[in-house]
């Protein structure tokens, strides 16, 4: 009997996302319920954005939740390497096989040519897609341009008509017209694969039998199915999971909800409760109970109990569930967990240098630096009153800073300062006009330790969460303002 093997393949390009944890949990439970294996693979072919720091955060976040893997970059295994950046020769080999078999082709089109092509198609009211012009090149012309070292990509061929039937374990057969599919790039001009080629090759070579992934990948499933057909490989069973959503039913995003697992760890949520809550996202126990452990979820896991309606990720409900778990802890364990969460040596050593020089007694530490150990702050709107700025300008400055910080990939003091500086300069203000607002939002006080140091220590999610909290306290942002301010944001360097 074939061993069930599932996997999660996150990209290490930022903080570990709760959506990644959600998909990892369901893949883990499916594998373990069938006595199988769960694999962790790192999709790090985006060389500009991928970092080993983000990779380690993924490891730490999943382990904090209690999700362990049988094979992966840090534990090894017989199907490695488990980082896509280390599998370049493998992808090149299989891409060449597709070209030699006539299923893929070399494309030498420049970015300018592609942009012009799409502009002309849109002007004609057509859906932008590659028009196949490279297929008209003769073999001699292709070889000449390859020999000359001309930049190129490898694209797959796709049918121009007909229907692709996607067998989904949740929805049954889903029909998708081939004319919606573009001639997908498989190998980029830097020699690295795109998601589609790497995904198919890795899943096959690693013996993945079942793929549970987010439903946002369903529209592009025909490309993956066609690649399996081209290679002559059996495709894994496919299951497209419903996406997590904000309370307003929009797709879960960091603009409306904290999305990093590390945020919830820092906020003092229990990993058991977090995992329990993610397990309830579109799935339920046979007896409908709300509180259950990972072991209980594995024991009773059944895909047929997954609802296709977009599950709502609601922090208030998560907090309620966390309270159920927390209050059932023995007092000794409760005390130990509080100490580990708030007063662990690593976190204290980050804070101590910024507090020590500002206090005369230990009793002054809590009033000065207590905000380091809180989640949502009790804010006073009076703290945001400014002699220089109107109430609308206060909200505008804070919202633009929040948006600017959302684009920050490396969370460092100098870069945080640069974001704030860019916003105030674009508004023809001074840094001193914005900093009191930042003190108020981040620390809940008019003055404290360096707010820039505090933001670096608190991290991106908690910092952005507090800025959103302050903006909401001051009345939020209207649709009209949102539209106008986003245009302004686009002009900020």
Swiss-Prot record:
<dbReference type="InterPro" id="IPR020751">
    <property type="entry name" value="aa-tRNA-synth_I_codon-bd_sub2"/>
</dbReference>
<dbReference type="InterPro" id="IPR020058">
    <property type="entry name" value="Glu/Gln-tRNA-synth_Ib_cat-dom"/>
</dbReference>
<dbReference type="GO" id="GO:0000049">
    <property type="term" value="F:tRNA binding"/>
</dbReference>
<dbReference type="Pfam" id="PF19269">
    <property type="entry name" value="Anticodon_2"/>
</dbReference>
<comment type="function">
    <text>Catalyzes the attachment of glutamate to tRNA(Glu) in a two-step reaction: glutamate is first activated by ATP to form Glu-AMP and then transferred to the acceptor end of tRNA(Glu).</text>
</comment>
<dbReference type="GO" id="GO:0006424">
    <property type="term" value="P:glutamyl-tRNA aminoacylation"/>
</dbReference>
<dbReference type="InterPro" id="IPR004527">
    <property type="entry name" value="Glu-tRNA-ligase_bac/mito"/>
</dbReference>
<feature type="short sequence motif" description="'KMSKS' region">
    <location>
        <begin position="251"/>
        <end position="255"/>
    </location>
</feature>
<keyword id="KW-0436">Ligase</keyword>
<dbReference type="GO" id="GO:0004818">
    <property type="term" value="F:glutamate-tRNA ligase activity"/>
</dbReference>
<dbReference type="Pfam" id="PF00749">
    <property type="entry name" value="tRNA-synt_1c"/>
</dbReference>
<keyword id="KW-0067">ATP-binding</keyword>
<comment type="similarity">
    <text>Belongs to the class-I aminoacyl-tRNA synthetase family. Glutamate--tRNA ligase type 1 subfamily.</text>
</comment>
<dbReference type="InterPro" id="IPR014729">
    <property type="entry name" value="Rossmann-like_a/b/a_fold"/>
</dbReference>
<dbReference type="GO" id="GO:0005829">
    <property type="term" value="C:cytosol"/>
</dbReference>
<dbReference type="InterPro" id="IPR008925">
    <property type="entry name" value="aa_tRNA-synth_I_cd-bd_sf"/>
</dbReference>
<keyword id="KW-0963">Cytoplasm</keyword>
<dbReference type="InterPro" id="IPR001412">
    <property type="entry name" value="aa-tRNA-synth_I_CS"/>
</dbReference>
<dbReference type="GO" id="GO:0005524">
    <property type="term" value="F:ATP binding"/>
</dbReference>
<feature type="binding site">
    <location>
        <position position="254"/>
    </location>
    <ligand>
        <name>ATP</name>
    </ligand>
</feature>
<keyword id="KW-0547">Nucleotide-binding</keyword>
<dbReference type="InterPro" id="IPR045462">
    <property type="entry name" value="aa-tRNA-synth_I_cd-bd"/>
</dbReference>
<keyword id="KW-0648">Protein biosynthesis</keyword>
<comment type="subunit">
    <text>Monomer.</text>
</comment>
<dbReference type="GO" id="GO:0008270">
    <property type="term" value="F:zinc ion binding"/>
</dbReference>
<keyword id="KW-0030">Aminoacyl-tRNA synthetase</keyword>
<feature type="short sequence motif" description="'HIGH' region">
    <location>
        <begin position="10"/>
        <end position="20"/>
    </location>
</feature>
<protein>
    <recommendedName>
        <fullName>Glutamate--tRNA ligase</fullName>
        <ecNumber>6.1.1.17</ecNumber>
    </recommendedName>
</protein>
<dbReference type="InterPro" id="IPR033910">
    <property type="entry name" value="GluRS_core"/>
</dbReference>
<dbReference type="InterPro" id="IPR049940">
    <property type="entry name" value="GluQ/Sye"/>
</dbReference>
<dbReference type="InterPro" id="IPR000924">
    <property type="entry name" value="Glu/Gln-tRNA-synth"/>
</dbReference>
